[in-house]
A protein has these predicted regions:
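Active-site-proximal alpha-helical scaffolds that flank and shape metal-associated catalytic sites
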Residues: 50-54
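P-loop NTP-binding/switch modules centered on Walker-like glycine-rich loops
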Residues: 86
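Acidic, metal/cofactor-coordinating or nucleic-acid-engaging core segments within structured domains
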Residues: 90-93
Length: 229
């Protein structure tokens, strides 16, 4: 779409749009979400980013506000597997067949008309899933007792309800807004565009002043993976 320079036509919420893509910026999805909580990047020298999606849980360590790409790792422990396991356990113990919506509501602590027995099974399995996730993360080489973890994505709310003090985690931060990635992308792009404009303005300044300003601009971009420009 970027190479063709041709207009793109689409409909969103009943409104027709016609756009031309002029520039593309790429950010790691979970890392972009941290743009909504920039204080986390400034306060912690290292943290683990855990994006709990439908099929996978994507892990990546952040060191000094920069994603450590060589630590990226995916676990096949997404929420689809969690829901499927719960459905099978409920069927095995009670003979009932729950829907995805029922299971997801109970995992999120929302109302659902079921027996206490079924609810207990769902909560027990939610805790089991959380324990399995923590164990798999540790086995992947991330010491959750030593570094803070930032959790986001659809499964983050499930883990937030089933953690226990006995897990002994260093620190957990939950980004539960389902729009957090979209907001993060918007803020990251705005910041990068601002930095580019500042660097461009250097060429319009006297040489000595421009060199100093350019160094400052480049130093500030490290929060965006160190290779924004």
């Amino acid at each position: 779409l970027l190479r063709s320079k041709q207009p793109v036509n689409f409909r969103f919420e009943g409104v027709e749009y016609r756009i031309t893509i002029e520039e593309v910026a790429v950010f790691p999805q979970g890392y972009a979400a941290l743009m909504t909580e920039t204080g986390l990047l400034q306060d912690e020298p290292s943290m683990l980013l855990m994006d709990l999606g439908g099929w996978t849980v994507d892990l990546m360590r952040i060191d000094n506000a920069i994603p450590a790409a060589d630590t990226a790792h995916s676990l096949e422990l997404g929420m689809i597997r969690c829901v499927d396991d719960i459905r099978e356990q409920v069927r095995r113990e009670t003979g009932l067949s729950l829907t995805d919506a029922q299971i997801e509501n109970m995992l999120a602590g929302q109302p659902c008309t079921v027996s206490d027995t079924v609810r207990d099974i769902v909560n027990r399995q939610g805790r089991k899933y959380t324990e399995h996730l923590l164990s798999a993360t540790m086995e992947a080489g991330f010491d959750l007792h030593a570094i803070p973890a930032v959790l986001l994505g659809g499964g983050a709310s499930v883990v937030s309800r089933h953690l226990s003090p006995k897990d002994g985690l260093c620190k957990t931060i939950f980004l539960l807004d389902d729009k957090v990635n979209a907001v993060g992308f918007e803020r990251a792009l705005a910041a990068v565009s601002r930095r580019k404009n500042e660097v461009l303005s250097c060429y319009l300044r006297p040489k000595v002043e421009a060199n100093l300003h350019l160094r400052n601009c480049l130093a500030d971009t490290k929060i965006f993976c160190g290779n924004t420009l």
